[in-house]
Every structure is written in C-alpha cells, then in structure tokens.
Amino acid sequence: MTNKPSRYTITSALPYANGPVHIGHLAGVYVPADIYARFLRSKGENVLFIGGSDEHGVPITIRAKKEGVTPQQVVDKYHVQIKQSFEELGISFDIYSRTSSKIHAETSSEYFKKLYEDGKFIEQTSEQYYDPKAEQFLADRYIIGTCPKCGNENAYGDQCEKCGSTLSPSELINPRSTLSGEKPVMKSTKHWFLPLDQYEPWLKQWILEDHKNWKTNVYGQCKSWLDQGLQPRAVTRDLDWGVPVPVAGAEGKVLYVWFDAPIGYISAAKDYFKNSEIKAVHKNNTWEDFWKKDDTKLVHFIGKDNIVFHCIIFPAMLKAEGSYILPDNVPANEFMNLEGDKISTSRNWAVWLHEYLEEFKGKQDVLRYALCANAPETKDNDFTWRDFQARNNNELVAIYGNFVNRALVLTHKYYDSVIPALGKLEASDEGVIMMLKEFPAKIAASIEQYRFREALGFMMDLARLGNKYLADTEPWKIYKENPERVKTILHIGLQIAANLAIVSEPFIPFTSAKLFTMLNLKANTWNNAGTIDLLKAGDQLGTAELLFDKIEDATIEAQVKKLEDTKQANLLANAEVKPLKENVSFDDFAKMDIRVATIIAAEKVAKTKKLLKLTLKTGIDERTVVSGIAEHFEPEAIIGQQVSLLANLAPREIKGIVSQGMILMAEDADGSLKFVQPAAVVNAGSMIG
C-alpha cells in the first residue's frame, strides 16, 4: 500500500481450542500483533485487532474423545481459558471471537454458497478410508498403523510421532481405525475443491512481483510452493463436527477447517460491529469498511506453519469471492523452541501461559519483554529460563527500573516530588535532548517494518540514555553546592521517563501504565513523544514504586526442574521395552532362590569405578556380594535398604573378592538403576516367588 491507510485490520492466527496457549504461540503471533496494534492506536490510527478461537477440525474431536466429552464441551472449556489468559497478558484484541458461534456458521456458509453459485469450485470423487463398524469416514488422525520407515506400530495417518516422518494413510502397514479398532476399507466420497492451480499465475504476480518487501522467510516459502505448482485443495471433508456444507447432497460433510477458520476473521468483525456504539469508536466505520475498502491495510500475524494458508490459499479465496481486500503484509515468524528442544503439546514440552500467569503474578511484562527480545523473526529461536532471568535482572531491573527509580526518588528527596523547573542547559543536556528526539521515530520505523526486536532494543536504549545521563551528571553529589543544576538534571530525567512511558506502552503496557501514574502524566500519544514538554514544572508526581524486582535463582531452578521432570516422564513413556527372552520351564525357575536381604555395609571396591562391595543380612547368614552399581549409588546412602537377592547363584571371585549371589536391579529408560524391593519392610530372608 503506497498511500496512507485510513484504517487497519489486524488479524492474529486463531489458536486451536483443544488446549491452552504456550510461549511459542505468544512469541510467534500474539505479542508482535499486540505491539503493532497498540503502537498504531497510540498514533491515533483507526485499528481493528481481531482474535478468536479455531473450534473446528479433527484436533478438537480427538481431544473430545480423549477427555470423554463432546467437542462443544472441549471448545467451551479451552475458549474461556485462552481468552482469559490473553486478557491477563494484556493482548488488546478489539474482539476475541470463536468459530463455533452462530454468526460464524452463517458467514462461512454464505461464503461457501457464493463461491459455489459462482462456479468457483470443482467436484471430485476420491477413495478414502472408511470404518464400516463406526459408519464413518476416517480423517488421517483416526487411522493408526505401522510406520513404513521405523516400524512404530502406532503411527498416525499423517505422521509418525516416533521418527517424525510425514505419512499418508495409504502408506501405513496394517492400518486400523482408532474408533473401533477394525481394519478400514476404501470407499468413494465426493468433495468440493478450490482449484488453486487456476490462481497460480495471479498469485505469482501478486506475491513474487508485487510483494517483494515481505519478510525473506515468508517470501521464500511462498516461492517454494509456487515453484512446485499448486493443486486443487478440498474445501469439504467427511466429519460430524464443523460447519455443515450448505448444499443439497452434502449430508455428513463439513467445511474443511482451513477454509472456515480464516473466514473467522470476517465473522468476528461482523460480530464486533453488531454493537451500534462500536461504530463511534472507529470513526463511524462498519465491518465492511475494515474488510472491503481499498484504503484499509490488512495485516495477518501468524507462525510459519500458517504461511501457505494466509499467503496463498486465503488470498485465493478472497480473490474468488471478489469483494474483499487482500493482505498488505503477512509478517510470519519462525518457531520458538524451549531449552534447545522443539515445543510439543503432546509431550507437554512447553511453558503454558495460564501456568506462567499463576506462578509469576504481576510479571506479565517480563514475559512480553523476554519473548519480544528473543523473537524468532527470521529463524527459529530458543527460550531458556536463564535468559528470561537475565533479561529481567540485567535489563528491566538494572536499566529501565533503575533509571525510573533514581529519577523519582531523587525528586522526592530534594523537591518533595514536585517537578523542578528547567534551568540553563549545558552542552551535555542539549546532546541528550537531541538524542531523545530521535527515539520515537526510530522505534516507529522498526515497528512499521515488523522488526519488533529492533524496536524493543531502541526502547531500551532510551532507558539506557536516561540511566547514563543521571550517572554522568551525578545529581546526588552536587546537590549541596549546585541545587539549581540538579533541578535541570532531574527535570530532564523526568521528561525522559515520561517519553519512556509512551514509547514502551506497546511492549510492556502494565509497566507503562504504572509509570504514567507515578509521573501523573496525562493522556499522551506517540505523536507527543520526543520532546521535553510532556511534564510541567511545579506539578506533583505520584508515589514512586519499584517497577521490576529481581528474579532469584531458586525461582528459575524450580522451572528448570519442572521441565527436567517432564523430559524424564517422556523418556519413561516412550521407552523401548526389550523383547521377551526364550521361555524357561517352571522347574528351571523353581531352582532359583530369590529372597529379601538387607544391606548392612557398603564400600567402593578399590581401583574400580563401577563396583560396590555389599554386606547383606539374608536371614540365614551374612554374606558379601559385589555389585556393579557404584555409578548410581553412594555407599552410605544405601545402608539399611532391602533388596532382592538371587541367593543360590554360584559364588565367583571379582577383583579378589568372593561374591555370593546377585542383587536384582531394574534399569529405567534413562539408564538409571533402581532396586527391586518390597513395598514395605519385611523380614530378611523372606522368599520371593
């Protein structure tokens, strides 16, 4: 868009309402989208910021089956949780809607019928797996079988979660239905397709020629798809959960979720403008103005897994309908990893937003700051709890918070919290004021180009400027001999803080609001920033408070331990179980004398790493056993433990020590050893069998 927009429509990818939101969602989509929306509002722009829950599709039905409830109960539960979590983090949607609403069903049905009646679809019949017992066609995730790549017997019809291979249902060996356990059959089914190949020439021109300014990761992925050639894509599927296909002969079919979900942006706008008072907030515009007028700028915020849908498929849908505007930009981010590993909801490898908000009360801005500072803007990035702690302690506390606290505390100490007058300026003052003037424009330029990490860095540089100014001028040292000079220093320091309150609002809005209150700063917008006229000499400041506090090591260690426990649980859940050995006769088994013994002494065997010399009380004697467990247990820690002893194993000499038996151990998935022992203390010598 070359001309200045009259309004902005900002959408953020609709999260699936089959589970809570995690930091990957936030870093990739919602924090940058909120920064952009808040920035534009601060500039006085007419903004519609749309969010909502994606409540249709197979992931919802799978979750419902897992929890033993209906799909509607699943989406009702998670929609509320997701919406509340976003509100608590300060994601400032104008509306957070949902695709199970009546208005969405009506909107997406009307959209489908318009394209259907205009002849934009093609009909195709294909063979698909069908479960005769359940009387249902099977989506990819409703089929499991043996992976042809690694032999995993529980691979899904679209992916093997063990080896990560992408699959199709027809590739599975011995496929079976997850609904009934029966072997599915192939059955013909008719569906409607959007012929993307017909839009390929237009898409190549629109994306590759007209939008070369898109982010390199977005442009590159689009080019790859277009170079491979586009194929017709089904807009309907056989499923009992979703928006019913609104044409005759389509019983048992619903709109494919990729088709109905982006229409959710449009239905959300319709829903929002049902309230007649809303129009006044948006300069008497209507929902159509935000979706159909050429002077509207449409921006989609998404993660990289949604690039094809928002850059190729949804634009083709909009083009086919004919009356809607097309996106001006789609600044998709890459993925945020967690402690060096890919975030995975199925493995519970995530930092969940609702848990963070509970465990780090009042620290919404710390998370927002850390995620923006490390945002995966053009490549995957990694969230670590140590980096989170460092961002808080070394930047928010030591720079931003320290500067603001110094300026306000010194003003309170010397002038009873009354803003002192600006006196004669020295060269250093004029230099600082000149630098101050540049910051709003620098930050704005970065935000407008979707470089949010860079913009955040400039915002923090303004705090650094204030910190350095106070450190260089040292007003606490010269107050007695030159109080007039201190008035000027603190006046400028407070003006920098006021500017900081304005330009930090898109990034850390809770902190900005506190700073506005502490400075008694009246409603000021972005356009006022860059001056030293925001505060008036003689005005009273509010009460100073610490904006940030240090996060201690123990707090971080608890979070790291939580993740380590999750990793161990995953190892156990996915451990390979060794196959059974050959059968033995009962008579052979009966020959083994296995009994409970108690360890009464333990010591390391000299010149070895793995061996412990154990003295055992067996109930019939005390004996020595040499065991290879030294790397797993400290000798003094196991004295008094009861163990299982194979007591009639023939003695043998190990490192000069005669070992009379063998301790039975279990090896865990992570290679650690555990004693096989009774659940409660029993008499030494008690038989096992």
From Swiss-Prot:
Required co-factors: Zn(2+)
PROSITE patterns assigned: AA_TRNA_LIGASE_I (PS00178), TRBD (PS50886)
HAMAP family cross-referenced by the UniProt entry: Met_tRNA_synth_type1
InterPro entries noted in UniProt: aa-tRNA-synth_I_CS, Anticodon_Met, Met-tRNA_ligase_1, Met-tRNA_synth, Methionyl/Leucyl_tRNA_Synth, MetRS_core, MetRS_Zn, NA-bd_OB-fold
Sequence motif 'HIGH' region, location on chain: 15-25
Binding of ATP, residues: 345
Stated name of the protein: Methionine--tRNA ligase
UniProt main location, coarse: cytoplasm
Subcellular location: Cytoplasm
Cellular component aspect of the GO annotation: cytosol
Stated role: Is required not only for elongation of protein synthesis but also for the initiation of all mRNA translation through initiator tRNA(fMet) aminoacylation.
Enzyme Commission identifier(s): 6.1.1.10
Sequence motif 'KMSKS' region, residues: 342-346
Gene Ontology biological-process annotations: methionyl-tRNA aminoacylation
Molecular functions (GO terms): ATP binding; metal ion binding; methionine-tRNA ligase activity; tRNA binding
Group of enzyme by EC: ligase
Organism: Cytophaga hutchinsonii (strain ATCC 33406 / DSM 1761 / CIP 103989 / NBRC 15051 / NCIMB 9469 / D465)
Protein residues bound to Zn(2+): 147, 150, 160, 163
Assembly mode: Homodimer.
